[in-house]
Each structure stands twice: as C-alpha cells, then as structure tokens.
C-alpha cells in the first residue's frame, strides 16, 4: 500500500513539472509584449504603405457638452456596476477612429515605429491597410504618442462612454435594441471580414454623432484598469486610477460578439499589446472650433 502511494505521488510530481512549459506558453500567448515577439518582416510592413487610392476622411471632432450622464449598467459584468450618474466637463472627441492615413503622417513626421504585427500575424496586415480603415497593431503608448503629437490626448473611460451613449443610459449608440447589422462585429453578414472604412455603418452613430463605438475595432482609452472603479471613482470627471497592470479598451469590434458589443462593456490588456483588433481615437479638453489637422 505504501509503495502504491509513493508511485502515485511520484507520478503527480512528474506530471506537474511536465505541465510547466505548457502553462508558460499559455501565459506568453496572452501576456507577452510585442517587443518579445518574432520580428516583423519588411514585406508585411510595406503593405501598409500601399494603401488604396481613396480620399482620406475629414479629420473631425465632436464637442460633448458638460453635464451628467448615466455610466455603467445594472445587468452587465461586475466591473460595469453599479450604474451611477457621473458629471463630465466639456470635451471634444474624434468623430472617427484614427485611420491608417492619419497615422502614417505621424510616422513620417516623427520617425515613430510603424504599426506592425508579430510575424505570426503578418498575413492579416494586407487586409487592414486601407487609407480610411482604422489603424491597428498599435500599443497603448503608440496611441498616446500619436494623440500628444496632434496636441490631443486619449479620452478617459468616462468621456468615451458618454460620447458613445449620450445621457439616457442606452446600451448601444442607437438605442436599447440590438441590431444584427447595426455595426461591424462578428457573426453577421455585413460584407466585412475585418475592419471597415471608418463611418461605414450609419447606425453605429452616437446621439452626438460619434461613429463606430459599437463595432469596427476596440479602442485604447487613457485609464488603467481597476475592476471596482465604477464603484470607487469620484462622481465628477473621474480620472484614470494612478497605476495598474492593464490599460482599458472600450467598444466592440469586428471580432466581438454577445455582451461585449454593449457600450458599457470594458476590456483590458497589457499596454505593450498590439494586434489587428485594437485601434484608438483622441480627445481634447475643449470645444472643437475648426480643423483638427
């Protein structure tokens, strides 16, 4: 009997050590920053330079007036609760997600690194290169640097949510009823395998006229992620928590399904992460009075 127990214990130890490399691979797949991934091929990156001969969309901003709005939900994820009334000062936000054309101007002017995937994603980059498709494969720092170059900043979570849902606590930019083809998301026959030209879905338009909040690509915002922040944050202009491990992403995308397409849904990722589903837009703490270029 003792010998049998010893054999079982020894077998469990062997299995535990054998599992460690697998666990490491899983952790690496989820958490490894872009810089540790295989190098990007020049051929893959060059595809971004040959964007379609399409006139760039106008670089517009929308001013969101000061006032209260209802943030969060009563029935979503734990980190979306409780539902509370929050006051946000006047700000302006990009009407559209930042496009490839706009980001390429930034790269050309500053020498900032190009958006690009690890080699394992290289085949997909050709489908994301359109002039007016949202730029993707950008980290949180890339997005933040672009906004600063433009004299802007990333929107806070509170600003982003107000801009996309208005003041009446709606679940989607258009209202409270899900529309299968209302935005560019997964598992619908909308004619788009990947991201679409910004503004392609007229229904995906907030009460203020901000486009693509429910679909197309997810968007980096300014905040560090904190699970209980909807409960703990101040009632007026809640800033980002001071520190964290993950940065917040908001909005749905062309790979998004189910509850994640609601405007209240919160996602998170390490700041160095880059892939084809994440883009961004910028904001300013002022009224928009003209050209944003």
Q: Which stretches of residues belong to each language-model region?
A:
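Functional-site microenvironments in short loops/helix caps that host divalent-cation chemistry
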Residues: 64, 70, 74-75, 118-265, ...
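A short glycine-rich, aromatic-capped structural motif
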Residues: 53-118, 138-141, 215
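Short, P/G- and charge-enriched loop/turn segments at secondary-structure junctions
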Residues: 49-51, 78-83, 266-271
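N-terminal Sec-pathway targeting helices
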Residues: 1-14
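Residues embedded in well-ordered beta-strands
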Residues: 62, 85, 171, 219, ...
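Ser/Thr/Pro/Gly-rich low-complexity linker/stalk segments immediately outside membranes or between
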Residues: 27-48, 55
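Hydrophobic alpha-helical membrane-insertion segments, chiefly the h-region
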Residues: 15-27
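Short, structured beta-strand segments at or near domain termini in extracellular proteins/domains
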Residues: 276-290
